[in-house]
Amino acid sequence: MRLRSLTVWALPPALLAAATAIAMPLLALTPPLAPDQAMQPLAQVNAALQAGEADKALTLLKSLPSSDASQGEAHNLECRVRIMLSQWNAASDQCQEAVRLDGQNSEYHMWLGRALGEKADRASFLSAYSLAKRVRAEFEESVRLDPRNAPALADLGEFYRQAPGMVGGGIEKAQGVASELDKVDAARAHELRGQIADQQKDYSTAEREFKQAIAASAHPASQWISLASFYRRRQRWTEMETAVHSAETAAEHDKHAGLALYDGASILIETNRDPALASKMLEDYLAGSSKTEEAPAFVAHIRLARLRDRLGDAAAANRERAMALGLAHDYKPEQDSKH
C-alpha cells in the first residue's frame, strides 16, 4: 500500500493514552469506504485518459493504494494510458496484470489483445508469430465472456480478416463475426463486410457496405470517415474529400463524433489536402467535449503544430507543441507518423 508520509508529534504518555482511548471507538464506528467512493479516483483517471491528459492520469494512478480491490481496473487504465503513449511493452504488462486480477472481465481481455497486437506489429517475425496467436486468444476470450461486446467483436473480425491461417485467421471466420455483429451493431457489421470485400478486391460491394454502415449508424460521422478511407485507398480524391466534409457536417450535430473529426483531419494531412479544413477539424476536436483516448489530445496538438508550420505560423506551432508537452511529457512526436 502506498502511504503518504505522516508527521507524528511527541505527546506525553498520559495524554497519548487518553487520545488513543478516545480515538479507538471512533475508528471502530467509521464505516468502510462505499464501492462508489472507492471508484471515484478511477473515474478521475478515466476522465484524464479520455481528455488525453496522460501525465495527470499516471499521477493519479500512482496515488492509488496498491491493496485496493479495484486494482484490476487501475492496471487496465494504466495499460490504456501506455497505449496512448505508444509504450507497447509497458501497456502489455499492465493489461496482463489486469487480466490476472480479473480474468472474467471481457474489457480487460480486449485491451490486452489490442496492446499485444500493437506489440506484434513492431516485433520480429518469430516474435510476431507467437504474439499474434496470443492476440487471437485474447479477442476470442473477450467475446466468449461477453458475446455482445461490439468493439471486441469488431477487433476479432479484423484479426480474422487480416491474419494468415497459420495463426488462426481467415476470411470465413471474419464473415462469421460479421453475422454476430448483425445482432448487436449493424453499422460495425457493414464496416467489417466492407473491409472484407475491399481485401478481396470487390470494390463495388465494399463501397455499398460502407454506405450501408452510414445508413445504419446512429452516429454516422465515423462511418463517413470509413468511406473516406476507402476512397483514399482507391485514389478517388474528390469523393474522399466529399466524404470528409460529410463527416464534419455530421459531427456538428453529434456530441459523440470527436474521433471522426480527428480521423478526418488525419486523412487530409496524410494526403496533403485542404490543410485549412484539417486545422479546423483538429481545433473543433480539441475545443469540444468529445475527446477520447482513441484520438489523444496531445497528438492532435502535435499534428496541429505541423499544420501551423506549413501555413507559416511558427508562433502558433510552438504554442501547440507546448500544450502537447504539458499533457504528455514522455510522448515522442516522432512516434506519430501522421505528418
PLM regions: where:
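Structural marker of alpha-solenoid helical repeat scaffolds
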Residues: 67, 101, 145, 181-184, ...
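N-terminal leader/linker segments that initiate helical-solenoid repeat arrays
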Residues: 25-84, 338
